Amino acid sequence: SGGEAPASVEAAADFVGALLDAAGVQQAALVGHSWGSLIAMEAAARFPDRISHLVLVGTAYPMKVSPALIQASLEEPEKALRMVNVFSRSTLAAPPSALGPGTWVFGAGMALGRRVLRSNPVVNVFHRGFVACDSYAGGEAAMKNGRCPVLFVLGTADQMTPPKAAQGLIEAARAAGRTVEVSRVPVGHHQMTEAPDATLFALRDFLQRKAAPALAA
């Protein structure tokens, strides 16, 4: 999309709110992966009456990013893409026909990353996203201020956002009295492509449940 890319999780969350307004959507379920999970979590806290369900896929807090990866994303984006594609997956050799005949997992990931980089010729969105993740410090407050049910979808072999790095958010959500569910899938950081059915079914089952009435803040 056009326009300036958000430079922080908070700015991106406000963009979500503006998008709901522009689309005339009064209430929505938010599903976010990685950086998107932080954005969805923050948006659910900022607009608690408008978010019915929150799904955090491949999340962690704090979501610290390796300084080497941040530097590479700015100075050598192609190198950073290779690093992410290696560490984001539990295997680069998908089981036969698991993702369709002839699927090239690494190549597809690289192609997608290059497309994202080309999507904004003014801003290096790759680097901007890493910095936003690394600097976000509002996780505990977001879990306290949000009210909707939360589902965590975590990859047991995730090296980018290890499951243990989400435990603080899980505990914060429970301490705030929110309904919390955790689904663990035996894959890496790309849950949507490495375990598409398990991820889809977890989302489906969670979203089909009617949200409990929101508690007053």
Each PLM stretch: what is its role?
Residues 62-65, 71-147:
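Conserved alpha/beta-hydrolase catalytic His-Asp/Glu region
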Residues 5, 38-86:
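Flexible "cap/lid" loop of the alpha/beta hydrolase fold
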